[in-house]
Amino acid sequence: SAVTGVPFEDAKHLQNETGIFIDKFYINQSSSDFLYDVMTEYGGCEAFYTDFYMNFVCPLGIVRMNAKGNEVNCNYYENKKLQEALKPIILESLQNQIDCGIDTSVCYCIGSGENFNFLSKINEEHHFFDTIIPLEHPRFIMQYNSKNKDVYMEKYLCALKS
């Protein structure tokens, strides 16, 4: 997502779905594959995006250098100093999105750990959403629990259809 700027959209799906090609970044992420599978089961991308708005808690794509010298995705919550520095930007971004008229009765938080904890904390302070439902992160599912992918897909679909 840091490469494309589109939530959970890798370069492969972006090109296949929209025709937009990002040179030198034609990669496929299992997180994106998982969410596309959920969307397909939901009724397809058009049905999904007709019913849901998807975006990041943090609007910035952040990368860091790994031990091999390669740029890798970095989540805003991996570094507490970074998280605090970005908090005003995050709050402004969330408010701007809400000001566009999105339904704030339910927020599905992709990431049931630190992302959910941070979003819940700022929601307690700012009352952005009536309810926040945590869903396991697709990377966690695909990297550590791929044998239970169907169980997690069903969890996503039940939450989204409730």
Where are the predicted features?
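Short beta-strand scaffold positions
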Residues: 109-110
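Short helix-capping segments at alpha-helix termini
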Residues: 123-128
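A polyanion-binding, active-site-adjacent surface
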Residues: 1-106, 116-120, 133, 143, ...
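Charged phosphate-binding loop/patch that engages nucleotide di/tri-phosphates or the phosphate backbone
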Residues: 162
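Phosphate-binding/catalytic loops
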Residues: 129-143, 147
